[in-house]
A protein has these predicted regions:
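Extended recognition/assembly regions associated with phosphoester-bond processing machinery
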Residues: 1-271
Length: 274
């Protein structure tokens, strides 16, 4: 599972201008435990006590994202325990009355089209689930209201606002160990606005946005070997991807931390582990 992130990724999320319905992360936002049944959480996971006392359980950057984007729902993993919380955004941040994971507020409505307010009551409903093994509480069904147009096909679509953020921050991507300084705020240039607007006109379907192409292709040989010590004697090579090539070309961007597919296999980047 990928759960490490850079300041740039957090900056990009904080720069997203529209409402978000659902966030899915590995880590919990920090201090989210204060807005659920903390006593029950510590009863199940007593080794969390020191981190709770020090107010360092969870990710501070993700709490910034939670406060900024205010999604209707936030789902996390990582801590291998089922836990629910209701986080208020527009009133006192005092921990709410503990809610169980099974408790649903009345008249709950969530949306997934057109970026209306994330939740009518100005809260985020947080849910983490237990480890996916027998006898653990690892599943819960959550129903969301969606626009009927979202159900007409099984395709995924690019989000125009996110494309603008990606295009405007590409110059901040670097392979150097020292990251480039980030601006205080992200301003979307007129050029980027025009590029994305043209993409929506030329490639969009007029309703849901720009369809993500189904252009998967095999870019590396299949692996059939096995090594008990985790090393098969080969050297891993950096490989490009046709989907990355197409994505960058669509936005008029160059490779900065990736390589084109046609250059795959030319640069050694370490050993291959299995």
């Amino acid at each position: 599972t990928s759960f490490h992130y850079r300041r740039l990724e957090i900056f990009k999320l904080l720069s997203y201008p529209s409402k978000v319905d659902v966030m899915v992360t590995h880590d919990w936002p920090s201090r989210i435990y204060q807005y659920g049944d903390t006593t029950q959480l510590l009863r199940r996971k007593p080794h969390f006590q020191d981190e709770v006392n020090d107010m360092c359980l969870g990710s501070s950057p993700l709490m910034s994202v939670l406060d900024e984007l205010k999604p209707a729902y936030w789902f996390s993993a990582h801590l291998h325990v089922k836990f629910a919380a209701i986080y208020p955004h527009f009133h006192s941040k005092s921990p709410a009355h503990p809610q169980s994971a099974e408790t649903e507020p009345e008249n709950e409505t969530a949306y997934s089209h057109g970026h209306p307010p994330a939740a009518a009551d100005g809260t985020t409903r947080f849910l983490a689930l237990d480890k996916c093994v027998r006898g653990r509480d690892y599943m819960q069904v959550v129903s969301l209201e969606v626009d009927s147009s979202c159900l007409e096909d099984n395709k995924l679509y690019y989000d125009a606002d996110w494309l603008s953020v990606v295009r405007e921050t590409q110059q901040l991507e670097t392979r150097d160990r020292k990251p480039l300084p980030l601006p205080d705020h992200l301003t979307i240039s007129e050029e980027t606005k025009q590029v994305v607007e043209n993409l929506v006109k030329e490639r969009g379907d007029g309703v849901r946005g720009i369809p993500i192409p189904e252009n998967f292709q095999q870019i590396a040989p299949l692996y059939f070997g096995f090594s008990t010590d985790g090393y098969d004697g080969t050297v891993a090579v950096e490989r490009g991807n046709n989907q990355t090539d197409a994505y960058l070309e669509m936005l008029g961007l160059e490779h900065r931390i990736t390589v084109p597919l046609e250059e795959s296999g030319k640069e050694e980047i370490g050993r291959a582990h299995v």
